[in-house]
C-alpha cells in the first residue's frame, strides 16, 4: 500500500521500505539515467526541526547469511579513491528546490542507473530498498552473488539530529518516484 507521507528520523529513528515490483517487467532497455526522487514536504516547523544532513538508500538482500541483511546498492554506490563512499554522486546530499507553494524544500535524487540496468538485463536481482538517515552502521559491500565485505558506513554527523517528512508513492503533488531515461533496443 502506498503512503501519502513518509517520516524519516535520524538514528535511532525511522526508515521506509521502498518496493518497485514492476521494474523487473520492463524488459531490456539501455538505461541512460535512473533516479529515485524523494521530495521534502514543507511544514512551518521545518525552521525549528531541521532535516537530516544526508539520507541513505540501501537494499534488503535475503541471500545474505549474516544477521544484518542489507547491502549497498549494487553497481551504484562505490568506494572512491579516498576510501569513502561516493555519497555525493549517489544522491545522499539533497539539493534545494521550491514546492508548488513557493516554499524551500530539499530534494534527494538517488542515482540507481547501473543497478537498474543490471536488473533489466537479468544480471541482478530486484531488491526492496530502505530509505533512512543513519549515524553509522555496518553494511555488506560487493556485487552479489560473490564475496562481500562488511564495511562501516558513517553518514550523518550526530545521533538523533534531524527529521523530515517526504512525499510517499501516493502523494498528490510530491510523489516519491523512480524516473527512468532510456532507449529501446
Describe the function of each predicted region:
Residues 3-185:
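Secreted, disulfide-rich extracellular signaling modules
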Amino acid at each position: 500500500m502506498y503512503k501519502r507521507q513518509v517520516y524519516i528520523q535520524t538514528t535511532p529513528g525511522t526508515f521506509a521500505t521502498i518496493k518497485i515490483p514492476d521494474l523487473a517487467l520492463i524488459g531490456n532497455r539501455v538505461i541512460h539515467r535512473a533516479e529515485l526522487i524523494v521530495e521534502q514536504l514543507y511544514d512551518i516547523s521545518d525552521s525549528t526541526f531541521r532535516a537530516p544532513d544526508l539520507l541513505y538508500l540501501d537494499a534488503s538482500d535475503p541471500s545474505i547469511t549474516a544477521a544484518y541483511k542489507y547491502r549497498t546498492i549494487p553497481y551504484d554506490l562505490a568506494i572512491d579513491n579516498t576510501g569513502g563512499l561516493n555519497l555525493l554522486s549517489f544522491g545522499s546530499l539533497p539539493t534545494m528546490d521550491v514546492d508548488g507553494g513557493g516554499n524551500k524544500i530539499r530534494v534527494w535524487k538517488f542515482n540507481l542507473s547501473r543497478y537498474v540496468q543490471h536488473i533489466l538485463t537479468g544480471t541482478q536481482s530486484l531488491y526492496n530498498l530502505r530509505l533512512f538517515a543513519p549515524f553509522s552502521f555496518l553494511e555488506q559491500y560487493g556485487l552479489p552473488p560473490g564475496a562481500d565485505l562488511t564495511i562501516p558506513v558513517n553518514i550523518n554527523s550526530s545521533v538523533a539530529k534531524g527529521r523530515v517528512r517526504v512525499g510517499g508513492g501516493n502523494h498528490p503533488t510530491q510523489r516519491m518516484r523512480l524516473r527512468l531515461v532510456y532507449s529501446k533496443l
